[in-house]
């Protein structure tokens, strides 16, 4: 199954690019602006949060907007823009009158998805794209970096030829040509063509850990991975805690040792996702399975739990002493980078432990554990997704309030300020309001404009909900649990049809784009291993 899912990942990585188009040159950037996608095919008006697409811009009052025929800016107010567009591809251009920079943002309508473009061949000066079907009305839009191309694409069915302009050929480092297409009311697959020093990237050996579309993750839970420093071992050894849910000794020093041994390089991965490293409570919490009114059963084993997993933060900016010191963490990150590996940190923003000094000092910073109708607000994942508590000892933070949101986004950035992490895996994203992600994304882009930081989130839900968090100014990616759950059924049950997974993959491509970086996984710490299902 791992090989099949990797093939899916590579297919979405390599499937990229074409349209009729034009471009100016902006500074080289690793993450081109994501397109504005109208979410409703019937409603031609949409309100846009500018920070979702231009988080690097500090003052939106300095922006001047222009559009193409069929697309119109209705109003700009309080960092929001109201846009109307017909069912055609368009471009919203934002010019910063203060810096002189221009940004071209693709605008795509919601439409039926169809695979219609493939890259066919290239030379040093041209790229040829094959259009798979004959269309009556074909629109092609080509951008290099965040600017529309200046020369039109030459299209004679079945081929469209893009001229690689002098500015593209003279660019240093990695840049991208993007192609968007509409045909006869259908949304065609978009294409992404990476360039290195102005030449088409044609070999996987040219891909590095900094290429978002080439991320291959290895997830590990620190306490259960490898013990590299026995001096920091400290079990609870409590009669209330079964040994299996006590600390086992894994630590950051153990990860460093395995990196040096070549364990991760031999696996062929380029990004290590480590579990949370913030300080958790010293004592045991939780008492399975008394939740939800379960009665005591003498035939079952009951236990409290240690915080070995890391998801009960007492402090949001201090390391768990059982796992590491600052010095050991710096060493691990340095060694990882020398071995060509990213390290992303699992970060918990949704909640804190009830004994956190932060909540002791600000007891009103969490949401209410009782709903207005008197019910307990626990594990109501969809009904009360922004306020529900995961458990009685980990209150959900009220991040819709600015006085709570602002310091919590600053706490997340401490890990980038103090350490050379390459990004975050964010826990429980759908339970955190969008204003948190917008503030975090804007602060990150403005404080670290030249640093490559990649963020992937955890959200269970439909593509619309999952995709609402994936914007240039929020998350780069989310795990695609819809593909995961479908794959588990299809690969694990002989009676299931492969058509199901094909449908789910096509739905993801239509929702997130053909070169999205959504995470296709074979499992994680919340899921049983496939072999045990």
Show which residues each predicted segment covers:
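A short beta-strand micro-motif common to beta-rich folds, especially ectodomain repeats
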Residues: 86-98, 175-181
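Short, solvent-exposed loop/linker segments at beta-strand-coil boundaries, enriched for Pro/Gly
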Residues: 64-74, 144-150
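Extended acidic/polar, glycine-enriched regions
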Residues: 155-210
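Low-complexity, Pro/Ser/Thr- and charge-rich linker/hinge segments at domain boundaries
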Residues: 38-40, 108-124, 197-218, 224
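Active-site-proximal helices and loops of the catalytic beta/alpha 8
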Residues: 35, 341, 411-413, 417-521, ...
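Solvent-exposed, low-complexity, repeat-rich "mucin-like" stalks and linkers
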Residues: 32-62, 117-137
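Substrate-binding/active-site clefts of carbohydrate-active enzymes
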Residues: 215, 225-419, 439-449, 454, ...
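C-terminal motif of bacterial Sec signal peptides marking the signal peptidase cleavage site
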Residues: 15-16
């Amino acid at each position: 199954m791992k090989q099949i899912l990797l093939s899916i990942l590579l297919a979405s990585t390599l499937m990229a690019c074409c349209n009729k188009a034009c471009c100016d040159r902006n500074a080289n950037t690793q993450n081109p602006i994501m397109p504005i996608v109208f979410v409703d095919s019937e409603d031609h008006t949409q309100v846009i949060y500018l920070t979702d697409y231009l988080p690097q811009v500090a003052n939106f009052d300095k922006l001047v907007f222009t559009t193409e025929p069929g697309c119109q800016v209705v109003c700009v107010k309080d960092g929001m823009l109201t846009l109307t567009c017909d069912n055609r591809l368009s471009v919203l251009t934002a010019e910063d009158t203060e810096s002189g920079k221009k940004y071209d943002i693709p605008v795509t309508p919601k439409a039926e998805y169809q695979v219609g473009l493939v890259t066919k061949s290239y030379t040093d000066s041209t790229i040829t794209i094959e259009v798979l079907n004959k269309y009556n009305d074909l629109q092609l839009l080509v951008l290099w970096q965040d600017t529309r191309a200046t020369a039109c694409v030459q299209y004679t069915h079945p081929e469209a030829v893009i001229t690689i302009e002098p500015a593209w050929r003279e660019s240093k480092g990695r840049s991208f040509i993007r192609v968007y297409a509409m045909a006869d009311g259908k949304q065609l697959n978009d294409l992404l063509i990476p360039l290195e020093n102005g030449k088409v990237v044609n070999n996987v050996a040219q891909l590095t850990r900094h290429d978002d579309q080439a991320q291959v993750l290895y997830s590990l839970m620190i306490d259960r991975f490898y013990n590299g420093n026995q001096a920091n071992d400290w079990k609870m050894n409590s009669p209330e805690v079964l040994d299996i849910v006590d600390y086992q000794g894994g630590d950051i020093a153990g990860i460093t040792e395995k990196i040096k041994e070549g364990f991760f390089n031999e696996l062929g991965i380029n990004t290590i996702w480590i579990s949370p490293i913030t300080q958790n409570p010293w004592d045991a919490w939780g008492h399975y399975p008394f939740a939800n009114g379960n009665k005591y059963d003498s035939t079952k084993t009951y236990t409290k739990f240690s915080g070995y997993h890391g998801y009960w933060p007492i402090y949001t900016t201090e390391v768990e002493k059982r796992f590491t010191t600052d010095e050991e963490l710096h060493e691990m990150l340095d060694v990882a980078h020398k071995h060509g590996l990213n390290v992303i940190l699992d970060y918990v923003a949704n909640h804190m432990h009830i004994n956190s000094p932060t909540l002791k000092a600000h007891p009103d910073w969490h949401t209410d554990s009782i709903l207005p109708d008197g019910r307990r607000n626990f594990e109501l994942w969809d009904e009360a997704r922004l306020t529900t508590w995961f458990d009685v000892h980990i209150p959900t933070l009220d991040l819709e309030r600015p006085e709570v949101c602002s310091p919590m986004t600053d706490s997340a950035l401490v890990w980038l300020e103090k350490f050379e992490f390459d990004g975050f895996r964010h826990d429980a994203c759908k339970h955190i309001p969008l204003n948190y992600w917008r503030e975090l994304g804007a602060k990150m882009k403005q404080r670290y404009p030249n640093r490559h930081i990649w963020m992937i989130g955890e959200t269970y839900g439909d593509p619309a909900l999952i995709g609402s968090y994936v914007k240039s100014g929020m998350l780069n990616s989310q795990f695609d649990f819809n593909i995961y759950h479908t794959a588990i059924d299809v690969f694990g049950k002989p009676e299931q049809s492969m058509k199901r997974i094909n449908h789910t993959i096509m739905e993801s491509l239509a929702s997130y784009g053909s070169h999205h970086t959504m995470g296709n996984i074979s499992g994680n710490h919340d899921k049983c291993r496939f072999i045990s299902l």
